[in-house]
């Protein structure tokens, strides 16, 4: 569970860092770029710890996929970016992919021990 929390922190840091890049580019100067640098760095640090117990492909796909989803939503809400029909279809496809990837990470059940046979 701890490593999933680290992955969630990596995702939040990535979203914050990427949004601060846009924030800096629309006129808020160096503070946005400094925040971007710090948050993207933290994001990779958290991700590097998360992949100690979460498969790299799964962690990276969730990190990037969930990040893109929330960055797009916040870009529409905060920066008045346009959400076209194609973007909506892409986001829905992304959500389906995230669900499929996450459902494929369930731990297998404990192996059943073979009954020991009595020797005659």
From Swiss-Prot:
Listed GO MF terms: amino-acid betaine transmembrane transporter activity; antiporter activity; choline transmembrane transporter activity; spermidine transmembrane transporter activity
Gene3D superfamilies linked: 1.10.3730.20
Gene Ontology biological process terms from the UniProt entry: glycine betaine transport
SUPFAM superfamilies in the record: Multidrug resistance efflux transporter EmrE
Subcellular location: Cell inner membrane
Membrane topology note: Multi-pass membrane protein
InterPro entries for the chain: Small_drug/metabolite_transptr (IPR000390), Small_multidrug_res (IPR045324), Spermidine_export_MdtJ (IPR023740)
Similarity annotation: Belongs to the drug/metabolite transporter (DMT) superfamily. Small multidrug resistance (SMR) (TC 2.A.7.1) family. MdtJ subfamily.
Organism: Salmonella arizonae (strain ATCC BAA-731 / CDC346-86 / RSK2980)
Protein name as it appears in the record: Spermidine export protein MdtJ
Native organism taxonomy: Bacteria, Pseudomonadati, Pseudomonadota, Gammaproteobacteria, Enterobacterales
GO terms under cellular component: plasma membrane
Record's subunit section: Forms a complex with MdtI.
Residues that span the membrane, as ranges: 1-21, 31-51, 54-74, 81-101
Principal location: membrane
Known role: Catalyzes the excretion of spermidine.
Keyword Coiled coil (UniProt): no
Keywords: Cell inner membrane, Cell membrane, Membrane, Transmembrane, Transmembrane helix, Transport
